[in-house]
Amino acid sequence: MTGAKYQSLIESSSIQGANADYVEDLYEQFLSDPDSVDAEWRAYFRGVQAPAGAVDVPHSPIRARFAKLARERKLSSAGAAASDARFDARAAEKQAAVLRLINYYRVRGHQAAKLDPLGLAPIAQVQDLDPVFHGLQPEDMDSEFNTGTLAAADRLPLREIIRIVKAVYTDTIGAEYMYITETAQKRWVQKRLEGEVFKPRLSNEQKKDVLTQLAAAEGIERYLHNKYVGQKRFSLEGGDSLIPLLDELMRIAASRGVEDIVIGMAHRGRLNVLVNVLGKSPKDLFAEFEGKYSAESLTRSGDVKYHMGFSTDIEIIGKRLHLVLAFNPSHLEIVNPVVEGSVKARQVRREDDKGDRVVPVLIHGDAAFAGQGVVMETLQLSHSKGYSTGGTVHIIVNNQIGFTTPNPIEVREGHEARTSRYCTDIAKMLEAPVFHVNGDDPEAVVFVTRLAMDFRNEFHKDVIVDLCCYRRHGHNEADEPAATQPVMYEAIRKQPTTYALYAQKLVEQGVIGKDEPELLTRAYRDGLDQGENIARTTLGMVGNQYTVNWANYQKDSWDTPADTSMTLETLQRLAGQMHALPADFTLHPRVLKIYEDRVKMAAGDLPMDWGFAETMAYAGLVQEGFSVRLVGQDTRRGTFFHRHATIHDVKTGANYTPLRHLDADKHRFVVNDTLLSEEGVLGFEYGYSTTDPDSLVIWEAQFGDFVNGAQVVIDQFIASGQAKWGRLCGLTMFLPHGFEGQGPEHSSGRPERFLQLCAGNNMQVCVPSTPAQFFHMIRRQMKRSLRLPLIVMTPKSLLRHKLSVSHLDDLTNGQFQMLIGETEKLDAAKVKRIVFCAGRVYYDLIEARAKQQRADVAIVRIEQLYPFPRANYEAQIAAYPNAKEVLWCQEEPENQGAWYQIKHRLRAYLADDHDLLYATRKGNSTTAVGYLKVHQHEQEEVVRAALDGGLPVRGGA
């Protein structure tokens, strides 16, 4: 490689020589006034500036000086001057070449690092790392050069400079960080990597500790392999260094005053982590393998052992540390936002705004980290308002394969399973540093763990450790991997274990005797034979002032009455506080009208609308000591311009959230407009709600139709978390729902899907039809000693419907009614048909009935579809003894809405002489038509059919 090739490369750069004068002028302008240049150029110039302490100066005076010197050359010997100039130019070019070489090692050294423990991936020949490529020759090796920002002596021989950068960047650690635009962060990483390269990483005692951790990692796997032959355990073998990695992480955390670590991980290595990191009793684990379960666990459906979570307190470096391993399904990476939400709730409880006391740790697989979209959503939340947890430590157990799909560190062109070179490349969007490390070098693993934890502590930012390893067995222990990866598994069969390699190294170093590895292995195995854990000192669940007693939230039943009323004095006082604006605060005229109307509503001069009732529900809860967390993509204003929880000064742009000023603790009310994510955000809120039962956590969809973007969270956590894991959750979901001619993407919150998931009183599905019902439903969610998910089909056009209003005494005297009977004074004896319905269609029905002057049809609203209010329903049937037709009306298609999930309940409590009928749109593969006139015709037909008798149920219900 020659200097000419480097010149060719430079000439193809976007900053090429032809633009040098332009760039030079821009840089001088930047030095004079940084804000005078474009933001992109400003960021670039800051990135190339020298470290703190060195100051760049404008070059134009220097160029002028050189011009003057050139003119004065005529006064000296032309030959001598030319010789000196050539020498100076060569020296300057050599010095520049050395600095370029250092920089290229920082940028591309990771590509030549020895990361693959199997040695299957050939070490890349990166031309930028060849000194000759930069014009440096063998005769330059002993010449001294300035080292620039290299964390070393100011001047060193080129040979020593190359030795340093090779050791730092191309050994068993590959560091990626040069894309970070914050110079302080970049320099910090450089200093730590380069400044400690030849220092001993571990003392002899620490090396022994690491060996002990590896003995435990290997020991549990071999024990289970021999004792429970053929049973799935998703072994960690090949990635054994994860155990000393986590041990070091916890030691550092405890030394810094961290109180809680919440871990999220998939199935790979989970049992190993449970026993050797969290200290789960091996005896309890063996019982799970043998099918022995406690009586309490058999009261629910349960889950497989490698999905189960665990919580405990451990003692490490003389300090107590609370560890949590989150429950999770097999849907890879979906636990990530759940962990972040749980961590956030713990931090808020401790007023830990920076994230110093609670740390999230996420353990990923390489294939899933690169492939699952929720990874990006969770990363994008990391610095979002209301979602930051002070930085997450991400650990990739990179075994270079996903079930049978290869994801090697280096892949042959045309055989890639992903587009990006590394599975970690998505993290670059955060400018998070990535430390790739060879899993068969445990000391390097411990070093990068310290580096990662220190970076997180210093900058409160996400950091990635890519543990490059392999999978010794198949996807599970019964699988045969050699059928699809014959070359890889031939190499794996010959590969000594990490424990064997490290033990041999320590024996050769004289750190341990040659018999010690076998003694460690035997001691660990003997402990397992006794069902004891010798790898971790556990304290059990000690608890502290932040510990939640969840038994207090299982005392009530779903039908336990709750006093959700509010005294008139309290209501009017809170309303006055809520709608008193700061001085000199100018509202938009439309918002001002809403606030002025709410003052009149509180005085009883206007009927109450939905926005007022909702706001007062939150105000009452905050005053009573509960917290409210209301989030969604347009939540502060409300998708339909009805809420205005945060108001804006139209002159200054300042904003103000009245509910945050009801209590001295502003944490009690949080309202956030979130990034455009359903899955990640809903997962976060689920995690938050399962950790803090005293917070009303509400996620609101922009339109209910978009909730299916988070279907995995709904299916695997919200609907089934209690049945599988015994996890209580009071999460509330607001799904704007209603057929109003807006087409198939803005009509339905898919109530049928939620109702299909309902069983065992696992959650509540409600469709409130009045502001007062909304008020009481919200307050009921917190006032009962019960925590169940609440799914609400919320209104759209009803927010301003002239009939959908309430009055003050509805709030001061009422409670949530699971079913609302006929409101007109009908002669019960004359009623021939009872129409049951839910939601917006009720108002179409009563308007049509009034227009037709029908007195033979009673219209009843079922406000809670699940759990089904059987007693209320039976009372309505009994109230109309001559009504032999019971009809269900819904505006959704027949195969959607509540009909298919509710008809058996409607039928079950009818007498033999009752007919069950229905009136719906005809079945459809989509939710709604896209044409307004067709929609209007369909709606009229549904209402007409309901009042006239509908269709009979054929073949029973």
Where are these regions (language model features)?
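Subset of Sec-pathway N-terminal targeting signals
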Residues: T2, L9-P51, V55
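Thiamine diphosphate
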Residues: T2-Q7, Q16, T389-K514, R727-G730, ...
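Extended, charge-enriched "interface" segments that sit outside catalytic cores
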Residues: V48-L242, V258
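Glycine/aspartate-rich loop-and-adjacent alpha/beta segment that forms the canonical ThDP
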Residues: Y105-R108, A112-I164, T172, S281, ...
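Active-site cores of enzymes that catalyze phosphoryl transfer or operate on phosphate-rich substrates
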Residues: F198-I220, G291-E340, K344-E351, P658, ...
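Cofactor-binding active-site loop characterized by glycine-rich and histidine/acidic residues
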Residues: E259-F435, F640-D692
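Hard-cation-handling environments
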Residues: T498-Y499, Q509, G513-V628
